[in-house]
């Protein structure tokens, strides 16, 4: 796929809260350090486990800022920039870049979707307008669109995508995607 090749274990990070629904920074730091000490190859913040869709913009910023501070360049920081449409995703992507993310992770647009041509255009726009590698997040249970492996392979071969986080549960398509990228 594009530029640097990311391999290995890149787990999603749960974002802990205090009793009053604030970020529990001490627990967050312990969890991050534990995973890095265990040998992970990167960490994914603000995905489904990080409750990105339930987070305000301020909360997203706080999570990314603290994650970048705690990780301190020991492993790549992957940040979910998930939202309903391309312009909002771009805003999240620009902010994550400013805060020090290494890789951006985006689903296709959801809620109002015109089809696969729009999905392809979405990822092309992200690639053109953001300065970090982009991973496509294939999670049809949440966004109601399955990203076709042929489209993902094409965008990867063209350098639009640096990788895929596959949470589709479709192991056959995943195998085809892997074979295409060997």
Give the residues covered by each predicted segment.
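Active-site beta->alpha loop and helix N-cap motifs at the rims of alpha/beta catalytic domains
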Residues: 2-146, 152-154
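Catalytic alpha/beta core domains of metabolic enzymes, predominantly
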Residues: 128-129, 140-182
């Amino acid at each position: 796929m594009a530029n640097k090749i990311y391999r290995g274990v890149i787990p999603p990070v749960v974002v802990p809260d205090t009793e009053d629904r604030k970020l529990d920074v001490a627990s967050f730091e312990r969890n991050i350090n534990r995973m890095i000490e265990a040998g992970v190859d990167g960490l994914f913040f603000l995905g489904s486990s990080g409750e990105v869709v339930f987070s305000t913009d301020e909360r997203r910023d706080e999570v990314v800022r603290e994650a970048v501070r705690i990780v301190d360049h020991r492993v790549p920081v992957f940040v979910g920039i998930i939202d309903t449409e391309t312009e909002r995703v771009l805003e999240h992507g620009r902010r994550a870049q400013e805060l020090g993310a290494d890789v951006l992770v985006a689903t296709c647009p959801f809620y109002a979707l015109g089809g696969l041509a729009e999905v392809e255009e979405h990822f092309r726009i992200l690639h053109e307008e953001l300065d970090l590698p982009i991973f496509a997040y294939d999670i049809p249970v949440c966004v109601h669109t399955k990203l076709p492996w042929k489209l993902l392979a094409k965008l990867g071969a063209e350098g639009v995508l640096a990788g895929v986080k596959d949470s589709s549960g479709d192991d056959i398509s995943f195998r085809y995607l892997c074979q295409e990228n060997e």
